[in-house]
A protein has these predicted regions:
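Rossmann-like AdoMet/SAM-dependent catalytic core
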Residues: 1-6, 41-125
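Active-site segment flanking the S-adenosylmethionine/decSAM binding pocket
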Residues: 1-53
Length: 125
């Protein structure tokens, strides 16, 4: 069977190159039911990260975020260096209400590095 006729889950973890394929994801968004994308080096690429997320949100709703705790936060203005963002295509999302969640979610999110400090944050869609 032709996989391109199916709606699929796309998971991206390509160590900083994810920004280079955002246009491809948007161009092929109708073939993607769910998207899990790990954004790297966010502190260095803050504007690119924000722009990429805004563009993806035209077709996808954010349903979950997981912060990687490998690097401690330096100050209150610092943002996470690595975030895993889970999104669902707007056409199939039945729960289109505003999304707000405190993270981590108990029994769902676990630290990538258990000996490092936990990262707590809130997100509003």
């Amino acid at each position: 069977k032709n996989i391109y006729n199916k709606k699929n889950l796309l998971k991206i973890d390509i160590e900083g190159s994810e920004y280079e394929i955002i246009n491809d994801i948007i161009r092929h968004n109708s073939k993607i039911k769910m998207l899990i994308i790990e954004f790297h080096w966010i502190n260095k690429n803050k504007n690119l990260f924000i722009h990429s997320l805004k563009r993806l949100k035209l077709n996808f709703d954010v349903i979950h975020i997981h912060a990687n705790n490998y690097r401690p936060m330096k100050n209150s203005d610092d943002i996470f260096d690595v975030l895993e963002v889970t999104m669902v295509h707007k056409k199939i999302n039945k729960y289109r209400k505003a999304f707000r969640q405190n993270f981590p979610i108990k029994n769902l999110d676990f630290e990538c590095f258990p000996n490092h400090k936990k990262i707590f944050f809130s997100f509003k869609n």
